[in-house]
Amino acid sequence: PDPLPPATLAALQAGTAALADALRGEGRLQEDPLALALSRSVELQAEAVARRLRGRRVLVTGGSGCVGTRLRRLIAGFEPAALVNLDRVPHRGEGIWARGDIRNPEEVTDIFAATRPEVVFHLASIREPGMAERVVREAIETNVYGTRNVIEACHRAGVAQAVYSSTGKCYAYLTDHVYTASKKLAEAQWMAAARAEGPTLFAMTRFTHVLENGVVAREIAEGIATGLVGLHGPDRHFNVQNLRQATHLLLNALALAGQQAPDSFWSAVDLGWPVNTLELALHQIAASGRPVGLRFLGVPCGYDESFFRGQFDWSERHDYHPLINALEAPTQFADRSGTMIGARVATCPPAALQAALDRLRGSLATTQEDCLAKRALLEAVREVAAASLAGFCPRRLLEILWWGAAPEWAGDTAQMLRFRPIITVFAEALLPALEAPAAAQEPALQARLAALAGSLAAISGMEALAGRFAAATRPLQAA
């Protein structure tokens, strides 16, 4: 944003101070919103980690960043035979830097051949949602095809264990954001590799916002230094975990690889309540002792997420976790310490996944337009989601569709229109079972189908699906 006139800046600073005073008068802003988050931990299973690191050759991709630097320090404490960081930029601290870019398969192959890793941690990615929207092709090449290059290099080199750091944003069934979409395709490939028989055990973690490496805290600090902090809005929240939780998750995923379902991930149990960015900014401003103004810039592309109610399980049969969706919730499991929670990822048939990746690659080869590359990326995610849902229990699909699209809580037409792609992919996956000759005719299910038909009919472009849902209730009505 352009610099503000001095008078405007002074007015914002005065208004911000008055807002902070008012909130303190209500008993708010008394504690650092991040203090509790920074104290949380995931119990490190040190003995099991040591058995898989001591005396072995370890390679970290993207190890020059915040998480990678802390991870390398921890790995070094377990006395590996060698520690290599494959990254485009040099690092400080432990290990040897191997300059390389995971987008280049030849570079990745050469580095793996030269260093002969036995353990791999794959962290390299375009990790900021806003940046991914600005560098669409680079995000796809890095997060999607770079991950494929790492998987193939692990296979060729006979790596024993490989751990991938995914994102909690992958709990979304579908997305219209480049970052989430690219990471979902990376997850799908990693899980496919985990299911396949081969020399490598593939394991995965899902992170949420890592405090010490986070965009929000950094932008607030930078704004305080200039006297003006920009926020997306007054009522924005985000889940957080700390660097200790993130790195312990990675090491524990290595230690436990092979002890749970291969196509699963680990996350931290204790993520606390989401942090309000306005309260965080006001607390940090007060702590600085400087005159600082606040302004709301609006939610940029990549961060404008809407909550689809069917994303989470409302049955009360499973524990709620913000990084586990309703498809994954029934598969939950925990580690012995109770500080990690895991779940399985929906299976995409390998042929369908490969076909989606091939079509995406073909689209990238024929266009230089970011908007067209993004469209192809989102379509690939839709194809993978549709193929994954095709193998799911119809009753579960109906349950999720009911939670997300039933008239009681579906929201207005505009809200429903936003979720049309998600509703469509679930409805299309469910219909073959509903239209089968032996389809269940329980009154409760039929009532839900009739109600859903009404919801679908209200969404532009879904009239045909609504008609098919309505038709599924007719045999019972006739009886």
Regions found by a protein language model. Give the residues of each.
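Non-catalytic terminal and boundary segments that flank Rossmann-like NAD(P)-dependent oxidoreductase
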Residues: 1-57, 371-479
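N-terminal Rossmann NAD(P)H-binding glycine-rich loop of SDR-like oxidoreductase domains
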Residues: 50-78
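Rossmann-fold cofactor-recognition segment
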Residues: 93-105
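NAD(P)H-binding glycine-rich loop region in Rossmannoid oxidoreductase-like domains
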Residues: 102-142, 173
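A conserved pocket-lining segment of Rossmann-fold NAD(P)-dependent short-chain dehydrogenase/reductase
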Residues: 132, 219-248, 252-274, 294-306
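Conserved Rossmann-fold NAD(P)-dependent oxidoreductase catalytic core, especially the SDR/UDP-sugar
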Residues: 134-137, 141, 145-187, 202-203
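Active-site Tyr-X1-5-Lys
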Residues: 176-205, 213-225
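Mid/C-terminal beta-alpha module of Rossmann-like enzyme folds, strongest
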Residues: 256-356
